[in-house]
Curated annotation (Swiss-Prot):
One of its GO terms (biological process) is translation. One of its GO terms (molecular function) is structural constituent of ribosome. It comes from Verminephrobacter eiseniae (strain EF01-2). PANTHER family: 40S RIBOSOMAL PROTEIN S14/30S RIBOSOMAL PROTEIN S11. GO terms for cellular component: ribonucleoprotein complex; ribosome. InterPro entries: Ribosomal_uS11, Ribosomal_uS11_bac-type, Ribosomal_uS11_CS, Ribosomal_uS11_sf. Belongs to the universal ribosomal protein uS11 family. This is Small ribosomal subunit protein uS11. Located on the platform of the 30S subunit, it bridges several disparate RNA helices of the 16S rRNA. Forms part of the Shine-Dalgarno cleft in the 70S ribosome.
Length: 134
């Protein structure tokens, strides 16, 4: 049996709620393959986010510092629209987009109050993967 056409009222589109938040946290996840930037308020509610792959970079170009810079600018502009003025930056991961993403946020005029490295380090937990042989 064929499905009936969906009502427009049933398709709810959530409107962006503009919050007025002055201070926030920028979570930069820099892996070897991609860089993801999420800007949250102090409680951890996401205000904006962007990734290198989401900005049109594909394959090995996602992991470049320039791709991380572009993603940071997009996330930063959206956060400025939400009222962000001060940011604490938490960097996670060893990727090449670590530094350039922080510089891009600072260049937008956002005051960076602290930069901290929160990369998870095991206290000799799980056995690591075998060595790559190229």
């Amino acid at each position: 049996m064929a499905k009936s056409p969906v009502n427009n009222a049933a398709q709810r589109v959530r409107k962006k709620v503009r919050k007025n938040v002055a201070d926030g946290i920028a979570h930069v996840h820099a892996s070897f393959n991609n860089t993801i930037i999420t800007i949250t308020d102090r409680q951890g509610n996401a205000l904006s986010w962007a990734s290198s792959g989401g900005q049109g970079f594909k394959g090995s170009r996602k992991s470049t510092p320039f791709a991380a810079q572009v993603a940071s600018e997009v996330a930063g502009r959206a956060a400025i629209d939400q009222g962000i003025k001060n940011l604490d930056v938490e960097i996670r991961g060893p990727g090449p987009g670590r530094e350039s993403s922080v510089r891009a946020l600072g260049a937008l005029g956002i005051r960076i109050t602290s930069i901290s490295d929160v990369t998870p380090v095991p206290h000799n937990g799980c056995r690591p993967q075998k060595r790559r042989r190229i």
